[in-house]
Curated annotation (Swiss-Prot):
The gene is hslV. Belongs to the peptidase T1B family. HslV subfamily. Gene3D superfamilies: Glutamine Phosphoribosylpyrophosphate, subunit 1, domain 1 (3.60.20.10). Keywords: Allosteric enzyme, Cytoplasm, Hydrolase, Metal-binding, Protease, Sodium, Threonine protease. A double ring-shaped homohexamer of HslV is capped on each side by a ring-shaped HslU homohexamer. The assembly of the HslU/HslV complex is dependent on binding of ATP. The keyword Cytoplasm applies. This is ATP-dependent protease subunit HslV. Pfam families: Proteasome.
Amino acid sequence: MFHATTIVAVKKGDQVAMAGDGQVTMGQATVMKHKARKVRRLFHGKVLAGFAGSVADAFTLFEKFENKLEEYQGNLQRAAVELAKDWRMDKALRNLEALLIVADKQSMLLISGSGEVIEPDDGIAAIGSGGNYALAAARALVKNTDLQPAQLVQEAMEVASSICVYTNDQIIVEEL
């Protein structure tokens, strides 16, 4: 379900960075696009969001999440919980296949369609087919280097792209 995507985010203090690869795969064997933008700025540039899953579903969720951010004046946690409620309860939304990582300078959350809103304990989150590789790399880098979040996510994505066939090295990094 979550092939052709890796998203990783790191929060250190009031700095946060998120990175995603650019590969879009159709089916199991055909790369359709190399430079897709899977990480975006939302809510006047104050929130980062990245998705893994169906592109059409992700656009729907980005739009709904941004509406929730507007409704709750940029309160990331409240917007995330309300999106997760809608996602779980609404018949049309329930069928969407995607995961989101959202972050602002205060917090980072992983949002799933089954209603989970999870804040990572260590300020590091990753999703998608290369997510476990990126997560392991980011944790090792945070523990053993003094790199800033933007450098950390870049390096973690490079590790993931060297291992996961559904993740390419066309990496987009956003930071707050």
